[in-house]
Amino acid sequence: MEDPLSSYKLIKDLRSGGEGKAILYEKDGVKYVGKKRLFDNLKDANQGLKEAMSLARIVHPNTVRFEDAIMTQIGDQIEITIMMEFCEMGDLLDFLIELSEPQHHHTVTLGSELSSLNLGSEYTGSDIDSTTSRTSSSSSTNFEAALLLENNNNNTIQHSHSSSSLVNGTTSPTNATTPPITTTTPNNRHSISTPTLAGTTTATTASPSSPSSPSSPSSPSSPSSPLSPQQHPVTSPQRKSSKSERKKKCSLKERKCIVKMTVDLTKKIFKKDNSNHTTAATTTTTTNTTHSSSSSSNLNIEEHVIHSNEIKKGVDSIYLIEQTQLIEWLLDLSYGVQALHRASMIHRDLKSENIFISGSNKLKIGDFGLAIQSAHHTGSIHSETVGTYCYSSPEILNSTYDKTTDIFSLGCIFYELITLKLLSHNRIYLGEDMLNDRFDSMQFLSTFPEKYEKLAPLVLSMISKNPTFRPSIESIIETLQKMDTSLLKERVVIKRENTIKGIRKQLDKSHFQEASLLLATSFVKDPRFFNIFPPSDPHSIPHLQHLYKYILKVLSSYNCSIWGYFAIDGTMVSCFVWLNPEKKKEIRLSDCIKGSLSLVTKIGLKRVGLILDLMRFDDNILSMAQNNNNNPNTSTSNLQTFKGSSSSSSSSCNHWFLAYCCTSEIFRGNGIGSHMIENVLNWADHNGVETRTVVFENNSIEFFQHHGFEVGSEFKSNLPKGVNKVMVLVRKPKQIY
């Protein structure tokens, strides 16, 4: 019988691993990767054919294309060769390793100590173990990292990260003395076992120059995990190469995938020289610098684009993937996952090592060895722990998962592409940290470059501990498609002086006229009011002002905390209204009656009737926030129609509730919102009580997430016309030391 492989011309071996090897073939001028595996019996071989079946089911531009599956008898064993598309640019992990800065090989918890790794602390290149190899495979790029680290051994590099909200947009360095924190796997092993190409393991230990360095957990990924066949030939070093040898190897390696990169300006321009001024030589060599003619003498710095093959890799990388290329890649990955899910497949091992780059720089999902059919399952699928530890969701670590676990892993890859910080190199284990209540969402958000902070809430939602709160792949695609990449182009304005000076103080009745106008102007486009006070109606703002003036009077009788911020000329530019702890959050029937009588002559009987319905709806919202029901499918019909919170226990009232907040449009982006909210948040932390609020649109979430709020509940049914959903946001009190 003719050998089925005879029609393919063998080019070279690409990689060998614990489960087999990958070989490059050519047929009719087209190159293919053959993934070879040996099995002892037919039953095991049939299991091995699952990957071929999974590949054959998916035909999509963003998944690796299946070509053929060949089964051959070799003695007592069965060999299966799966032929698939060859992606000549290699895998995404190798590409990211080439671009990313060498990191401390420390275990990291995304808590308050996260920034001690490389986000704001000083460190020297000599502290890094240059012998550590990448998890699941070895790569010659490690020699590049080791060489560059040796060249920088005597240089102290200082990094900074954003610790700002969307409101103030400032940058501050992290405390350089913060010690790194150690985490361990459930087995509490203190060394990292890295599978080599031969299937054996090598131990990675902390650098001798850093005796206090925490040890790293052992990765559950076994040497027999499915092979990533698209990678190029590499050699696992048996000894430390000399500096000259490594230099020679580095010079022979060329970057094959070339994409546009952009300068991370917020990191670049805030580097200071010894005199505490912005280093002029640094900014002018990479950006266009102009001085504004305004009185504040602002410094405007425009974005600069460079190709990835022009970048000299160093320990203080200032480059990010250019915004258009980044969004294209994020969409490539999303389209690939969408194709899987539409075919009722769960990949279960999404990671940057299993993402391949085609000749046209398109990303393709591959390695379907752990993919599983989900069409005949309802609810969660119960199985053994699978996947790769750094990218594993909390539920997959608990062996219970569904399609949403792919969303979690996809969020991890998004994080690596956006930040160029590799999870495995930084020892970041998101799923483990969430299971052990060590994950700090605020610290996670602060690791994003300010240039791409608009993407941070999306990624945070994708890695939500609760799978129910993760967005669908369709929702992710819609968000990315609607994103205007021009808004991600960076233009940094350094304010030479603070142009906003004012005072924050509590309001009394004499301020309600001005506060109500500010609220009316800010909330005229609130979806709750679309049908009552259309934004296009010139009378809507005056009518809303009457309504808010009455609301402020009522809330003041409840002893609520009403705060305003006044600019230097005495104009009120911000207003925050808080319902205090220990007070029932409800709208009383008597207030509704008084309100309808006082407003009927000002806004008309019909609108008063609609407002009464709205008050009932608002009362249900207070009940939602008070009970903090964590079932996102709960609707207002399941709550009490009126005075919904009156039956709640007194303990459920013990939280601050932000009822209204607004800042005049021309004063936004100057940190006023953060200044207004921080006093109550500090009180809440001191007293150990929660803070809650409610939002009706996704674009309102970002500000609150930057201040530690998370989505506690979401409601989508039985809502007033114009309101698509209601989200209750909850902020847990931070521990004060």
Swiss-Prot record:
**Residues annotated as region Disordered?**
155-251, 278-298
- The record's active-site residues are D349 (proton acceptor)
Which keywords has UniProt assigned to this entry? ATP-binding, Kinase, Nucleotide-binding, Serine/threonine-protein kinase, Transferase
Q: Which InterPro entries match?
A: Acyl_CoA_acyltransferase, GNAT_dom, Kinase-like_dom_sf, NEK_Ser/Thr_kinase, Prot_kinase_dom, Ser/Thr_kinase_AS
**Family of this protein:** Belongs to the protein kinase superfamily. NEK Ser/Thr protein kinase family. NIMA subfamily.
Per the record's keyword annotation, is Nucleotide-binding included, yes or no?
yes
- The enzyme's first-digit EC class, named in words, is transferase
Q: Which residues bind ATP?
A: L14, R15, S16, G17, G18, E19, G20, K21, A22, K36
Q: Specify residue ranges for compositional bias: Polar residues.
A: 156-167
Q: Which GO terms describe its biological process?
A: regulation of translational initiation
Q: Where is the Protein kinase domain?
A: 8-488
Which GO molecular function annotations are given, in alphabetical order? acyltransferase activity, transferring groups other than amino-acyl groups; ATP binding; eukaryotic translation initiation factor 2alpha kinase activity; protein serine kinase activity
Pfam families for the chain: Acetyltransf_1, Pkinase
Catalysed reactions, semicolon-separated: L-seryl-[protein] + ATP = O-phospho-L-seryl-[protein] + ADP + H(+); L-threonyl-[protein] + ATP = O-phospho-L-threonyl-[protein] + ADP + H(+)
Composition-biased stretches (Low complexity): 168-229
- Identify the PROSITE patterns for this entry: PROTEIN_KINASE_DOM (PS50011), PROTEIN_KINASE_ST (PS00108)
Please identify the protein, giving its name as recorded.
Probable serine/threonine-protein kinase DDB_G0269628
One GO cellular component this record assigns the protein to is: cytoplasm
Q: EC number(s) in its UniProt entry?
A: 2.7.11.1
CDD domains recorded for this chain? NAT_SF (cd04301)
